[in-house]
Amino acid sequence: MFIKICGIKTPEELEIVENYGNATGVILECVSKRRIGFETAKNLVNLANIPVFAVSTTSDVSVWENIIELTGTNYLQMHSDIDQKAIDFIKNEYGCFIMKSFKIPEKSESPENDAQKIISDIESYEVDRILLDTGKGCGQTHDHRISQILAKKFDIVLAGGLDPDNVLKIVKTVKPFGVDVSSGVENNNSKDEELIKRFCENVKSVKL
């Protein structure tokens, strides 16, 4: 199963993540305690042996162009209502792999109805990968009855409040293509190797 460990800030964190995960991410151009500058991000992209996603909440094409040109990444993770025309421009101009986030409510009165609305939203986009999250890196779990429905229709990457203690049960329930974690493998705002190791071992133990 695909494992992305997001929100790295240093070469030391990158090295830890590379030992366990398939991809990582750097937070740019948004409000986050994990946000880093372009130079730091470029250095991490250059050092990395795994894909480094540039993660941002911007819907401004010119900002995405800056991110791509100043970091050198080919992987983008979009947490905004950016339109398909803008995505097409970025894909045609730069050839980037794009993962688009879709928000799932924390609690649903009608999982089937909510899932159908989100399916319509997803189907209005053409992107390389679909990320299901509770919010913009809020670290809270969402209603997995919805993501379970979506995972039957799309290859989804699941995010939102995952940690070493809950990921096994959640992955068995939702059956996603992959998972994305950040705060759930941190200690004192830094990536913790023991938490990352436990998280990845639990994910990899699941046979879907």
From Swiss-Prot:
<dbReference type="InterPro" id="IPR013785">
    <property type="entry name" value="Aldolase_TIM"/>
</dbReference>
<dbReference type="InterPro" id="IPR044643">
    <property type="entry name" value="TrpF_fam"/>
</dbReference>
<keyword id="KW-0413">Isomerase</keyword>
<dbReference type="InterPro" id="IPR001240">
    <property type="entry name" value="PRAI_dom"/>
</dbReference>
<comment type="similarity">
    <text>Belongs to the TrpF family.</text>
</comment>
<keyword id="KW-0822">Tryptophan biosynthesis</keyword>
<protein>
    <recommendedName>
        <fullName>N-(5'-phosphoribosyl)anthranilate isomerase</fullName>
        <ecNumber>5.3.1.24</ecNumber>
    </recommendedName>
</protein>
<keyword id="KW-0057">Aromatic amino acid biosynthesis</keyword>
<dbReference type="GO" id="GO:0000162">
    <property type="term" value="P:L-tryptophan biosynthetic process"/>
</dbReference>
<dbReference type="Pfam" id="PF00697">
    <property type="entry name" value="PRAI"/>
</dbReference>
<dbReference type="GO" id="GO:0004640">
    <property type="term" value="F:phosphoribosylanthranilate isomerase activity"/>
</dbReference>
<dbReference type="InterPro" id="IPR011060">
    <property type="entry name" value="RibuloseP-bd_barrel"/>
</dbReference>
<keyword id="KW-0028">Amino-acid biosynthesis</keyword>
<comment type="pathway">
    <text>Amino-acid biosynthesis; L-tryptophan biosynthesis; L-tryptophan from chorismate: step 3/5.</text>
</comment>
